[in-house]
Amino acid sequence: MQDHHSTNESFDVIVIGGGHAGCEAAITTAKLGFSTALFTINLDRIAWQPCNPAVGGPAKSQLVHEVDALGGIIGKLADETAIQKRILNASRGPAVWALRAQTDKREYSKKMIEILQNTDNLSLKEAMITELDIAKTEEIGLNSKRTVKKRIKGVRTFFGSYYSARSVIITAGTFLEGRIWIGNKSMSAGRSGEQAAKGLTENLHEIGIKTERLKTGTPARVDKRSIIFDDLDIQPSTAADKYFSFDPDIKNNMPQVSCHITRTTTKTHQLIRDNLHLTPIYGGFIDSKGPRYCPSIEDKIVKFADKESHQIFLEPEGINTPEIYVQGFSTGLPENIQLELLRTLPGLNECKMLRPAYAVEYDYIPATQLQTSLETKEIEYLFSAGQINGTTGYEEAAAQGLVAGVNATRKLSKKDPIIFTRESSYIGTMINDLITKDLKEPYRVLTSRSEYRLTLRGDNADRRLTQLGYQIGLINEKRWSAYQEKMKLLEEEKFRLNKTRLKNTEEISKKIELETGSKIKGSITLKELLKRPDFHYSDLIKYNLTEKNLGSSIQEGVEIDIKYEGYLKRQKNNIEQINRQSCKSLPQEINYEKIETLSLEARENLNKIKPKNFGDASKIPGVSKADLTALLVWLKIREIKKEKANIFIEKKLSSKKHSV
């Protein structure tokens, strides 16, 4: 990069992109005392929700709880701007319970802008970054081997302004060379109504970072005044008292609204089949992979041809807008056919379309080029977070933004990065998946991706991560005190339930036996009572067997801990056993191609990813248990050879001293 202009300003950290990843990253670095600038193409669309105006859902809600437990923002804003909340999977076990909030998208963005503007050490800049400035230094290592180290120095905007930075975090979302498609028509855009980011992809290639192409999409928005709601099933808000945030000061003053449900019809399906050739994917205009778990309506009709109907949700985008988001109905069909399709749905026969659905393809950075800290392997102090890493969803983006922000500051402070493991969090599961697997489609977090989902619940995210958030410096003293008080009450209640015993001769015992149909033999502790499948903490309250008026989160935590005690102990033992084996480090200089006892696929994948330890190596596709055993043996032989060489050298040196 030629420096045609002098430095405008200098910052410790520059964040490129003002989406959910960028906001979390910028707030994190600024809160930790580092001068930060957040650059975005449009300051009026900060933390925008260009697709679904919702936060949470299966596994995603666990991510939001975790980000909040660490001191992040997304959970608080989702709580404060929620206009509907529901618990998903409530009839199943606690491992998969999920809070989902419909949010007011304009209110969400407005509140995020207010937070950014009032965060110390943080500057907001409207500009398009097109170049990264890299410094190169040559180092001489072992055996006089020369290596070139690259480090980020600063950034340049489209119009030539230069800003120096000690660290840079790229959170460009879908904007890198973004192109939106409606039918066979396309235009350059990061999302509808906003220009794409030009130039940065080419610059990334020049500095040694590869990019590939992905696709996503968003459905049409319709005018709620044109919908016949009497023809639809209603879906009311049923969990307004549930929160993503563990901060007791967070409140919601938004009015609660209902969503509605309609379904596709045979007419819908036939119209799609007749026009498949006009879509960007089936028409062959683009070949980028779309998200498996959020397919277009044409994908659903093709892949589930035997299904007669698909559920479609109508979700308000806010309190003061007539726009309704047609969830489950994203498409790349031409605009006129989209309206025809919408009018085949019950309740939408006379609807007015305010915004058409569109597909968007964009460049992303395959995350196998990143370290676990989200720093790029190629360039020091350059981090990448969010949808640019191949993920889909605000929640995944926010979590990565916080991790990148924390680790950028730790790198600048010469501290070791914070590494989130699969055993500790969904954040760790997601990052491990991203950096060890070649993505062929946008990645979304799922409960099925975690081997430890009973341990990694949403309700206990604070117990798992708040202490870490406090140690990092993102949890303030007030929040820390509230957390400690909660832990104290939770442990005291579990102790009380274990010690308090009911005799079967007591009147309350007879009442419980009569109403539950389960006998009490001799006597029983309240803990043993709570272990029964059909007995809940609410029953303890009902039978006046409580002492303190504990909050619902403590009641829930106590019940889960007791009911699932055996399972949780087994999972804890498994985690400890895995940790003992997986923490064994793997030297980064190993050339796996030369280890002939490894399978060819294992050699290729290990060399490409360069795992830091056996735990990471075990999660790489194509690396079998046999490969891990062979690698362990190879390392042991290597260590023995090194020890023998050291003994030989010591003897040589010793004999030389004696001869002198």
Swiss-Prot record:
Belongs to the MnmG family. Keywords: Cytoplasm, FAD, Flavoprotein, NAD, tRNA processing. It is found in: Cytoplasm. The keyword Cytoplasm applies. GO terms for cellular component: cytoplasm. NAD-binding protein involved in the addition of a carboxymethylaminomethyl (cmnm) group at the wobble position (U34) of certain tRNAs, forming tRNA-cmnm(5)s(2)U34. It comes from Prochlorococcus marinus (strain MIT 9301). SMART domains: GIDA_assoc_3. The keyword Transmembrane does not apply. Homodimer. Heterotetramer of two MnmE and two MnmG subunits. Its cofactor is FAD. This is tRNA uridine 5-carboxymethylaminomethyl modification enzyme MnmG. NAD(+) binds at residues 290-304. GO terms for molecular function: flavin adenine dinucleotide binding. The lineage of its organism: Bacteria, Bacillati, Cyanobacteriota, Cyanophyceae, Synechococcales. InterPro entries: FAD/NAD-bd_sf, GIDA_C_N, MnmG, MnmG-rel, MnmG-rel_CS, MnmG_C, MnmG_C_subdom, MnmG_C_subdom_sf. GO terms for biological process: tRNA methylation; tRNA wobble uridine modification. FAD binds at residues 17-22. It holds the Pfam family GIDA_C_1st. SUPFAM superfamilies: FAD/NAD(P)-binding domain (SSF51905). Gene3D superfamilies: FAD/NAD(P)-binding domain, GidA associated domain, C-terminal subdomain, tRNA uridine 5-carboxymethylaminomethyl modification enzyme MnmG/GidA.
